[in-house]
Design a protein with these regions (language model features):
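Domain-level signal for soluble alpha/beta catalytic cores
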Residues: 1-219
Length: 219
């Protein structure tokens, strides 16, 4: 007899006592170094996973947690750093990640706008002519973390390519589909590496499909 399985689209990152916000502000004010910051965020992240496990959730989302913004996470995973920030390739450094979100004295932050019709604001990715490339398989990293630290085989979460492009800027209206086509092989690589790791379920979010899109985009 088949079993009905429970899942969860995502878990609030803020924490019961706003732990996430407090750790973030400590790092921004130079009260903790990067290593301490990452360890403290890991504690919060794994506590959220453990709580869902203890409540009987079968397919626990992994990768929904973010150090700042999940759309920005997707952008940096594909090397999406605006040209005004001194990015030299490879995995995007933490300080560069936050520079995109907050800006520096010489480089303005990326735009923020509402996530659909909610009060949540995300960092708008910018396509500035550089080719997207996979520089870090973040869903795989979160899957391994939960498996190694908690023995949990969860469900990696990632924003789908169509939604990611539609929420971005820096390209002409007619170039959106071409950008999606460039991203598809990179997403395929992410999924292949997850499959090789033994991942059985992946949650790919495409909320843009719930909005009004053109026939051309559908095709």
């Amino acid at each position: 007899m088949s079993k009905v399985m429970s899942s969860n689209l995502g878990y609030p990152r803020i924490g019961e006592d706003r732990e996430w916000k407090k750790v973030l502000e400590k790092y921004w004010s130079n009260k903790v170094d990067e290593e301490t910051f990452q360890k403290q965020m890991e504690v919060i992240r794994l506590a959220h996973v453990k709580k869902q496990r203890d409540q009987g959730v079968d397919l626990i989302p992994l990768g929904d947690f973010s150090l700042y913004d999940h759309v920005l996470d997707t952008a940096v995973m594909f090397g999406g750093v605006p040209e005004r920030f001194d990015y030299q390739g490879g995995k995007v450094p933490l300080d560069t990640y936050f520079d995109i979100a907050r800006g520096t004295k010489d480089s303005p932050a990326s735009e923020m706008t509402k996530w659909f019709n909610t009060n949540y604001h995300y960092i708008v990715p910018e396509f500035s002519g550089s080719e997207p490339k996979l520089v870090e398989n973040r869903p795989l990293a979160f899957y391994r973390e939960a498996k190694e630290k908690l023995g949990i085989k969860g469900e990696p979460v990632i924003i789908g390519p169509f939604t990611f492009v539609k929420l971005s800027k820096g390209y002409d209206d007619g170039d959106g589909n071409a950008l999606v086509e460039k991203l598809v092989p990179l997403y395929a690589r992410v999924l292949k590496e997850l499959q090789e790791e033994g991942v059985e379920w992946v949650q790919m979010d495409e909320p843009i499909l719930c909005t009004s899109i053109s026939r051309q985009e559908v095709e």
